[in-house]
């Protein structure tokens, strides 16, 4: 963009000792009523590519670069099907060991409880009971939501949709894919705080 010449790496794609990850940038906060649930259609308005010594470092850098905030306060888990719950179980254990308070919707809370992971149960929005997910978000108790839908069918008024919209309106970090959520927790587990991330010049990656 600046008209400067950049030397091409001399290594092949299979010889690099670093990893590159691209993260999408979304603008759901500007789209009133839009469900921030990713499907096959293109929804991002841009992407950021970041490099790291391993996939966890590169992934965390890429997320932070598109405005994703690392959790400091509390995490809400609503992990969809029993298969998704099982796939996320070890990640939930890591979140607990990291000392992050875990909140969970009823079915997820029960699954965690059965596997000896402590969580605070919050009712779904459509249940209209207290304590509920929406009030916890409004009270500032949650700064990361992992909300994995049971299916990709779009319905105008579901508890999942209401949670995701509230998350977007409050600028809270959101993950809706179990693989992405697992990778994020692995990155958080191995790296810890964003202050541990190193910014290197391009020359160090040649």
What do these predicted ranges mean?
Residues 188-189:
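Histidine/acidic-residue-rich catalytic or RNA/ligand-binding cores of hydrolases
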Residues 1-175, 181-184, 194, 200-206:
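ATP-dependent carboxylate/acyl-activation modules
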């Amino acid at each position: 963009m600046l008209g400067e010449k950049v030397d091409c790496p001399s290594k092949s794609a299979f010889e690099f000792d670093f990893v590159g990850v691209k993260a999408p940038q979304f603008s759901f906060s500007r789209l009133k009523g839009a469900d921030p649930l990713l499907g096959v259609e293109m929804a991002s308005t841009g992407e950021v590519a970041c490099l790291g010594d391993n996939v966890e470092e590169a992934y965390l850098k890429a997320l932070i670069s598109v405005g994703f905030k690392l959790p400091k306060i509390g995490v809400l888990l609503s992990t969809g099907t029993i298969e998704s719950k099982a796939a996320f179980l070890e990640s939930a254990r890591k979140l607990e060991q990291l000392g992050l308070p875990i909140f969970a919707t009823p079915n997820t809370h029960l699954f965690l409880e059965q596997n000896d992971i402590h969580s605070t149960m919050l009712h779904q929005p459509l249940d209209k009971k207290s304590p509920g997910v929406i009030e916890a978000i409004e009270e500032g108790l949650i700064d990361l939501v992992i909300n994995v839908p049971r299916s990709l069918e779009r319905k105008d008024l579901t508890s999942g949709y209401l949670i995701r919209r509230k998350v977007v309106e409050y600028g809270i970090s959101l993950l809706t894919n179990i693989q992405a959520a697992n990778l994020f927790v692995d990155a958080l587990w191995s790296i810890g705080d964003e202050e541990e991330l190193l910014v290197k010049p391009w020359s160090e990656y040649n």
